[in-house]
Amino acid sequence: MPAFNRLLPLASLVLIYWVRVCFPVCVEVPSETEAVQGNPMKLRCISCMKREEVEATTVVEWFYRPEGGKDFLIYEYRNGHQEVESPFQGRLQWNGSKDLQDVSITVLNVTLNDSGLYTCNVSREFEFEAHRPFVKTTRLIPLRVTEEAGEDFTSVVSEIMMYILLVFLTLWLFIEMIYCYRKVSKAEEAAQENASDYLAIPSENKENSVVPVEE
């Protein structure tokens, strides 16, 4: 039985790894919306297919709208990568997956003028025997570019919660130590009182307190 308990966690890890390799899971994770000037910025666009075994013709279009402006095409994927003429020319890099569920792009050397609204359009035409349905999904990414990296609010909250938890655990441990100390002290005092009471009994009473054994 102990050997089985040791092998069970290992078998679970192997099973999880096998499932992840054999049955990859697509998760539509939203993109980050803040970038730092001069750094690369990945614009994440994920459009999962409910039935991955079905073949589909996929077309991806990336649009950019500056503040107070109109949308214009900056990148297109149609039977291959195609970067169109735009202010982003030479600074866009394809960062998608082979199955075209992840169709993200990366903006290199981000500038302050790159702030604005990015639109990711994914058009799919599925190939069935009877019909060819068409599905289109859209992802909007409002990007804000700053000169310097600001402190992440999520990390600040996580750090504060970590310190609060640490203080709580310290207080709890301190209270448990006091409780255990008092419990042990009371047990020792009770033992000493019993010993003192026994010693205070006269020797005659001790002899009389012995119960005779019937023959």
Curated annotation (Swiss-Prot):
Modification after translation: Intramolecular disulfide bonds favor the voltage-gated sodium channel oligomeric complex assembly.
Signal peptide, first to last residue: 1-24
Cellular component terms per the entry's GO annotation: cytosol; intracellular membrane-bounded organelle; plasma membrane; voltage-gated sodium channel complex; Z disc
Ig-like C2-type domain location: 25-138
Transmembrane segments: 157-178
Chain positions carrying an annotated carbohydrate: 95, 109, 113, 121
Keywords, alphabetical: Cell membrane, Disulfide bond, Glycoprotein, Immunoglobulin domain, Ion channel, Ion transport, Membrane, Signal, Sodium, Sodium channel, Sodium transport, Transmembrane, Transmembrane helix, Transport, Voltage-gated channel
Extracellular side: 25-156
Keyword Cytoplasm: no
GO molecular-function term, one example from the UniProt record: sodium channel inhibitor activity
Pfam families per record: V-set
Localization terms from the record: Cell membrane
A GO biological process held by the record: regulation of heart rate by cardiac conduction
Topological domains annotated Cytoplasmic: 179-215
Assembly notes: A voltage-gated sodium (Nav) channel consists of an ion-conducting pore-forming alpha subunit functional on its own that is regulated by one or more beta subunits. Forms homodimers and homotrimers. SCN3B is non-covalently associated with alpha subunits and induces the formation of alpha subunit oligomers, including trimers. Interacts with SCN5A/Nav1.5; regulatory subunit of SCN5A/Nav1.5. Interacts with SCN7A/Nav2.1; probable regulatory subunit of SCN7A/Nav2.1. Interacts with SCN10A; regulatory subunit of SCN10A/Nav1.8.
Protein family membership: Belongs to the sodium channel auxiliary subunit SCN3B (TC 8.A.17) family.
Role according to the record: Regulatory subunit of multiple voltage-gated sodium (Nav) channels directly mediating the depolarization of excitable membranes. Navs, also called VGSCs (voltage-gated sodium channels) or VDSCs (voltage-dependent sodium channels), operate by switching between closed and open conformations depending on the voltage difference across the membrane. In the open conformation they allow Na(+) ions to selectively pass through the pore, along their electrochemical gradient.
Name the UniProt record assigns to this protein: Sodium channel regulatory subunit beta-3
Source species: Rattus norvegicus (Rat)
